[in-house]
Amino acid sequence: MESADVVIAGGGIMGCALAYQLAKRDVDVLLLERETLGSQSTGKCAGGVRQQFSMEANVRLQRMAVKILEGFEAETGHPADFRQIGYLFVLTLPQQVEDFRHNMEMWHRVGLTEARWVDPAEAARMVPVLNVDDVLGCTFCPSDGIASPADVTSGYATAARRHGARLKEGVEVIGIDVASGRVQGVSTSTGDVATRLVFNCAGAWSASIGRMAGLEIPVLPYRRHIAVTGTFPAVPRTNPMTVDFRTSFYFHPEGDGVLMGMSDREDPPGYSTDVDWNFLEKVFEQAARRAPALAGAGLKTAWAGLYETTPDHQAILGPVPEVEGFWCAAGFSGHGFMQAPAAAVLLSQLLLDKESEIDIGPFAFTRFAKGALVKERNVI
């Protein structure tokens, strides 16, 4: 029977980053992905990397992630295509301005001192296509940006294999053997594996992996759409990721065109990734309001992926006490690509050193039983 110190269920950015961090510390790692690495939510995300969150723990996590991505190629030998064009949050309601004032105070306190306020006139200069008629203010952080999900995932996977990790594609986890309250092994579509520790990195499918161990992991899948225009020079590659916070509409330069998206707040949870063309019409309607020039941009392609959403829009990181040897790195609620680099480091530290350099206690699974939920408000 095959065996491993750690089995990772899921080969998206989180699983691959964790495989790398554990393997480079001489842990015998087996990662199992039922399709191909990075082919699900990771491969369908917008690639955003930001630090402007409402929860301090998320800001600290993201400051670490940005530093990791800045040094990614030097560490892994693989480019990340991390372009720090910044994130511009566009605020149109008085309550948003008040909330972001509190955010800004916290950001500066924890060291994100480059984040600053931008008035509507400056925002219009930064993003010439932006309609600022109803804008009350904006926040901007120049060290935020966008990176390539494919490059970062591939870089982690290659580096993990270089350190001895086994990453298997086309192999599905179909069961977890639990005896006397602890993990004993996993069953897969190609055979059984003996292990004492399983990491649930299955993204939108994390609840299914949890149920295999008799656990209820509160993660639901929600469809999110992305559209990319044809060539559109009015949004140059230096423009920031721009977010209309009230509607969740966002856009950023993508190649010689523009990538845009928006949350469908009426879409129920489910695993469909079919494109809803009626909803895409709403995206373009909002684009025409917030950035009128985009109304003339032709659609080049569109797709949909899945958010893995928890009740408080915060990740679940660390051990699940009910089953010894079952750990989670899931439920990132749309922030998995940007948070995985730091989460992988901190989880490997917690597992091997019994403590992490940044406290990830706020992301513990036990918060659900305690009812100690504090929602992350800056969700797109």
Positions of PLM-derived features:
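N-terminal Rossmann-like FAD-binding beta1-loop-alpha1 element of flavoenzymes
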Residues: 4-30
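Glycine-rich FAD pyrophosphate-binding loop
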Residues: 23-43
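Dinucleotide-binding Rossmann-like beta1-alpha1 core, especially the glycine-rich loop
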Residues: 47-126, 248-250, 286-288
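Short beta-strand to alpha-helix junction loop
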Residues: 60-61, 90-98, 140-158, 274-279
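Helical element adjacent to the flavin cofactor pocket in flavoenzyme catalytic cores
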Residues: 139-196
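Central helical "cap/lid" subdomain
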Residues: 191-238
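Active-site lid/adjacent beta-loop-alpha segment flanking the redox-cofactor pocket in flavoenzymes
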Residues: 216, 231-328
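C-terminal catalytic lobe of FAD-dependent flavoproteins
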Residues: 288-380
